[in-house]
A protein has these predicted regions:
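Core catalytic lobe of class I
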Residues: 1-186, 194
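Conserved hydrophobic residues forming the short capping helix/wall of the S-adenosyl-L-methionine
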Residues: 191
Length: 196
């Protein structure tokens, strides 16, 4: 409750609160503020999980990304290219290179909207410096999806500073909060190494 009160106080009306979790914590997280819950993504890590548990349960290679907000969220869908353009309309056999065919008024689609599964490998975890460290690419994706360039991103569980690196790569400002001095030092070092 106290954390939600702070989130409500500082979040913009169209801002997103983006939290990562795994079951059973995901369910508890959603139920802790069902009123602000919007939806979730599944992050397919493609690698990971504990092989020690593989004989009693499936190896977990996914994690939940849970989205909360006050109102209608800013959402910038990150499109993925189609292998072949698809035309929709009366004359859908006619495909042009432009997004709108001037002659047939058909809409030509060259991209897909995102699905709720984010496919970003976490294979480079050999160099991780925090037990729950996420790939920079995952945070870049989420930051681009829910913010404009120049906006401010808060990470109140900053760990090794991955959010800061993703913000620097996507031209966003950031505030990091981390309670363990060891990880503050690691985050500062990573940021200093990234900034030219």
């Amino acid at each position: 409750e106290p954390l939600w009160a702070h989130y409500k106080r500082i979040i913009k009306d169209n801002g997103a609160i983006v939290l990562t979790a795994s079951q059973p914590f995901t369910s508890a997280l959603v139920m802790s503020n069902i009123k602000m819950f919007k939806y979730d993504w599944v992050w397919n890590k493609k690698k990971g999980g504990s092989p020690l548990l593989s004989k009693i349960q499936p190896i977990r290679i996914s994690e939940d990304v849970v989205i909360f907000g006050k109102g209608k969220l800013f959402y910038n869908p990150i499109m993925t290219p189609r292998d072949k353009p698809v035309s929709r309309g009366k004359n859908k056999g006619n495909i042009s290179e432009t997004t709108n065919n001037a002659f047939t008024k058909d809409k030509v689609y060259t991209e897909y909207y995102p699905k709720n599964i984010i496919e970003i490998s976490n294979a480079d975890q050999n160099n991780r410096v925090h037990p729950t460290q996420k790939p920079v690419a995952l945070f870049e994706y989420l930051i681009k999806t829910y913010t404009h360039e120049g906006e401010l991103v808060l990470d109140n569980c900053a760990g090794s500073g991955t959010t800061a690196i993703a913000c620097l790569k996507t031209n966003r400002n950031y505030i990091l909060i981390e309670q363990e001095t060891k990880y503050c030092d690691i985050a500062n070092k990573r940021i200093a190494e990234f900034i030219p």
